[in-house]
Amino acid sequence: MASFPSPPLAAAAAAAPPRLAPGLPLAAAAVRRPSSLARRSSIALAAPANPLRCIHRRAVSPRLRRRTEAVGAASAAIGSLGEEREGCLSCFPRGRRRGRPGLARFAPCALPHTYGLSSLHSGLTGAKIRRRHVLHAAGPDEPHVASPTWSETALDKHYVDQPIGKEELEGFLNTPLPSHPKLVRGQLKNGLRYLILPNKVPANRFEAHMEVHVGSIDEEEDEQGIAHMIEHVAFLGSKKREKLLGTGARSNAYTDFHHTVFHIHSPTKTKEYGEDLLPSVLDALNEIAFHPKFSSSRVEKERRAILSELQMMNTIEYRVDCQLLQHLHSENKLSERFPIGLEEQIHKWDPDKIRRFHERWYYPANATLYLVGEIDDIPRAIREIEAVFEHTLPEGEAAPMSTASPFGAMASLFAPKLPGGLAASLTGERSPAADKIKPVKRERQAIRPPVEHKWSLPGVAQDAKPPAIFQHELIQSFSINMFCKIPVNQVQTYKDLRSVLMKRIFLSALHFRINTRYKSSNPPFTSVELDHSDSGREGCTVTTLTVTAEPQNWRSAIKVAVHEVRRLKEFGVTMGEMTRYMDALIKDSEQLAMMIDSVPSVDNLDFIMESDALRHTVMDQLQGHESLLAVAETVTLEEVNTVGAEVLEFISDYGKPDAPLPAAIVACVPKKVHMDGVGETDFEIHPEEITDSIKAGLEEPIYPEPELEVPKELITRSELEDLKLQRKPSFASLSKEENVVKIFDDETGIAQRRLSNGISINYKITQNEARVGVMRLIVGGGRATEDSESKGSVIVGVRTLSEGGCVGNFSREQVELFCVNNLINCSLESNEEFIFMEFRFALRDNGMRAAFQLLHMVLEHNVWLEDAFDRATQLYLSYYRSIPKSLERSTAHKLMLAMLNHDERFVEPSPHSLQKLTLQSVKDAVMNQFVGDNMEVSIVGDFTEEEVESCVLDYLGTVSAPKSSKTQEHIEKISFLPFPSDLHFQQVYIKDTDERACAYIAGPAPNRWGFATEGNDLFNVIRSSSGDAQVSESANTDLTERKHNDVRSHSLFFGITLSLLAEIINSRLFTTVRDSMGLTYDVSFELNLFDKLDLGWYVIAVTSTPSKVHKAVDACKGVLRGLHSNKIVERELDRAKRTLLMKHEAETKTNAYWLGLLAHLQSSSVPRKEISCIKELTMLYESATIEDLYLAYEHLKVDESSLFACIGIAGAESGEETTDDELDMGLHGMGPIGGRGLSTMTRPTT
């Protein structure tokens, strides 16, 4: 769903955001997207995981919010069994939008703040496992259970110090887990249940979510999609919700199988008068959920929007997700009630039919209200809830429901639904005698979702289903999913928590083992993932083995995956593995529990909502940690292997009489494949071949796992002392004029240093995240330094270094386990302007020194391997070949090549360019940029000055970095294609079974610091025009006006004004193109502002239908060019300011944001970045005027001669095939297609 324009202030990538480039992050290209149900407990077994995880930073929607799903509240105590997905189980609840592959999508931001700390590599779970810092981790199965009381001594001891009696142990394990001490639950007389949780982050704001327990699973045969329709009509038709927008509140809604959620993120008080906003927010939710207006005009408007959304969602990824869900749940309605609905039915419903469905399901007893945030006076909040909702009764229900005591048990959320009553509601029509019948109380269903499953349990007699095969011309790679479906194990006792912990240990070992197979240059698989997680939306626990491979390698890939699963099942984990992963989990839990007061309200709320759906006990982080410590002491190696083996039996024992049968086996395969020397041939595969390959893999001989030596340090104390004697590290003067070796700014707390080898250092001490630090190395150059003979050398080089993952004499496996033991997340990335490394580390047990050791080893003792180069080259080759199979990526690719005059530095390298590269050439391209005065390191965290400066001197001061850089001299000219040209407007046609369309419109813009193409300094233009004006002015110029002229000369003037402009244009696009004209569901305006290069551009992205896409493009152009005829008004500017300032204020509570603010503070290639850009950011936003915005608007090139557009159309009648020479349309490689369920939930409504 199209996001309402309120993107985060600083959502662009830190100093150098990703550009409009047709592609997903390389990690996505190299590794299949997560096994779709977005189960956070999935384990990426063999993604190209390595300690130096590589990302060529690409397009990310600024509104893209990672919403996590869940194993359960109590299992938060030990963390997810795997990675965090991009998005929820099926799509994008709460503001999340699918980032368009191929387009860099950025929030309007003056100072971008993050290169991607949220996706840092976790040493524990591999490249695909993005264990984010737990500001985000309030989800039900996140590792939030750390305790500040777990000592190093305790970590070193055996987990069971003294024998414990069997009866005593059983008694302890059967004890219920403690409940969250601050969570308040209650129920009104009409059945509405509410939950209130005080939470301090973000300050002065709260979340209010109304969950109505009705979704697509409750629809009848002729109502498919009607729950989603009601979500739209009720939400967007609410006048009370609209009134809140002026207060700085944000709102949205989404629909899934089992529920519909309306949510508002609001300040606690109005800015102007300090009035309490809680009553207004509750009133708006009451109107939306229980008193919507089903006017014909609103229904028709939303019908158009939903039909557009349906076509937009209908990607190959969505179709694959549907296939997986259909086979997994073939025995129940989950296989056929996708939330978006059926197009033919959406066309038919009139307001009365929609209203009848609402009357049947939208009543207080079938809803739960969640309030999380700065709610200091809980009794008052309860009174406000009662005042707003107490009198809301379902139509025809006169008698109040009996009062229930506040419910503490999870099961009370699932009161049984009475079978009788309201027969008329089954048809949606009122009986004439309805008023004479005694009203019957309506309560929510006892089971959500109300479906029956066929379980994959040992000894359950049922016929095995043969593997299903889904073939499509838009699928590029082979993937197979083996599913096992069992009832949810509700985590309510210590025994339940202990089981989750043991599974986590077992599956972590499986990931690491299979990952070692990436040592070979040509592994048979692209990725192997094992996902084990609970799903509230499906009402079951699903284990999924997902294998992806190049089509020609599919048999070998299956054999390797099932063979490794059987080996672990038969031999189990070793004592060393159990100790290692247990220690890592305990350390992780300590770190995360320290952040108990830093978890955002929305994440806590999601955590509670999903936990309640699964009936897991909800604990806070400290309770969870204490519970984890208690059960950890009882875990034995034998039990870990027993519990883990049960998870894997459906694979390891496949074909045996008593083995649990897979719920489904589904292969998604291309119709045609490219064979070297042959060309395109049909891809043939049969179910029995799949079965034979599984059995063959299980029959391979197996051997136990050898123990691996894990280094405790990468640089010994004696080695360090020798280095210090040789290189004599010291801090040098920051200025040639003065002998100043340190600058400290009292207002921001930022310290600046410079080492004698030329490396610049910025750091800030914060308590945002207790005993956690983040660090970023930025190296100037990036892809811009590639010349015509070395296209792709930088990104392939960075990927090669990452693929190898070795440093010095340590293997990749040793380095990865070193990261596991020290809770270090690390990534290595590149974009057009920079190469950068990012670290996230815990400060306990010398974690910061360990992170600095790793950085030192990468800089001093990096290892370049031929097989890693081969893998990196193959990954980019495969990704390039997959572009023609994606409508969005093909369209974006063609636009980029045209706009930037076929400059390959801004798109994926072509096969021709890749063939020219060698290991030495890519190594030189990367390492030539790693010179002293071209490197800047920023560190933010909860450390002391002594700690950070000691690490800096010891490990960065001893780097033998050259002191001069000639990077600037090697940047070839970058220019926009001149007008006139046939390439200013293009079209792309993709053959597909279903129709879809999208378009991109782009044009030149200045960079963040006021430089335009050809190096023109726009501040000179401003000074020239203002100088002419001053000649005629009085000498008594108003002081305020003079101050404002100072604002216009501020180095961040264009960054600020363009950010505000983007907010306003986004809002107008939504209102005009989507809401008024009904031409699209999803339209957005994004700015791409470089820091170092003297250019930038804007992008409008719009999805539509083939019949409307040209009109949508014209409408977007009209909005873009209409700012002169339809002037910006103060109300629009105020709203844009409020949105960006509130997000800035909220983000300053995070380390990652500060890391971005520090970027380039001492960079000679970004001379206009200085401390005032950080100190005066708020003032600059507040001071901006409409006239300032028009000054910036004059330098957005929106005329016909500067504007580029490309329309992409997919359908059976594909028109002319794309003839772009850069794309080899006949080659089909691997492309990420997502996984089960990722795209089936509806987009957020706005």
UniProtKB/Swiss-Prot annotation:
It holds the Pfam family Peptidase_M16_C. The keyword Transport does not apply. Its cofactor is Zn(2+). This is Stromal processing peptidase, chloroplastic. The keyword NADP does not apply. It comes from Oryza sativa subsp. japonica. Cleaves presequences (transit peptides) from chloroplastic protein precursors. Initially recognizes a precursor by binding to the C-terminus of its transit peptide and then removes the transit peptide in a single endoproteolytic step. In a next step, pursues the cleavage of transit peptide to a subfragment form. It is found in: Plastid, Chloroplast stroma. The active site is at residues 231, 302. It comes from the Eukaryota. The gene is SPP.
